[in-house]
Amino acid sequence: MRLCAVMTFAVALALSACVTTPREPEPPVLTLDARGIQPTVSQLRVDFGRAQAGVIDTVSRLLDEGPDAITTNVECGAGPVTSASWDDGLTLNFQDGQFVGWTNADPDLPVAGGFRAAQSRLAMPQVSFQVTSLGTEFSRSDVFGLLTEDDASIRLLWAGTTCFFR
């Protein structure tokens, strides 16, 4: 009988070693908001008005990759805008070497106010919608967004200066 108990315990122990505990998802490295960027790892903010080189360097370190492209659009209504874009959907906008705005389509980067790209319209906080030449837009506390063509989810979020043509 004792051997049977020992064997049962050994089998149970071996089986328990095969069970994995689900890991908590990694927290986002930053949160975008109406004033700029709040890194998760620091209380220091990256607000609008900061120098372009420092902002790009800081965000590149946070995302563990540099931007895929840095371009300048001289035909923006607000004046020439230089944009640093990451492949996942984040774009930072600069004018005269200063951080002035962002756009985001990356669902892994949260936006203050309870928004996230690709978030279902039904899961969004209370907002009012307006149909414009861009599509169905919304705003809350100086954070703006655009729904997908079928109005089912968030396609794009932004704050500050952008280069949209309406």
What are these regions (language model features)?
Residues 1-8:
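Bacterial N-terminal signal peptides that target proteins for export
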Residues 19-21:
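Bacterial signal peptide processing site
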Residues 23-28, 47-98, 113-166:
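A cross-family detector of function-defining hotspots
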Residues 14-17:
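C-terminal motif of bacterial Sec signal peptides marking the signal peptidase cleavage site
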Residues 31-42, 101-110:
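Acidic/histidine-rich, surface-exposed loop or edge segments in extracytoplasmic proteins
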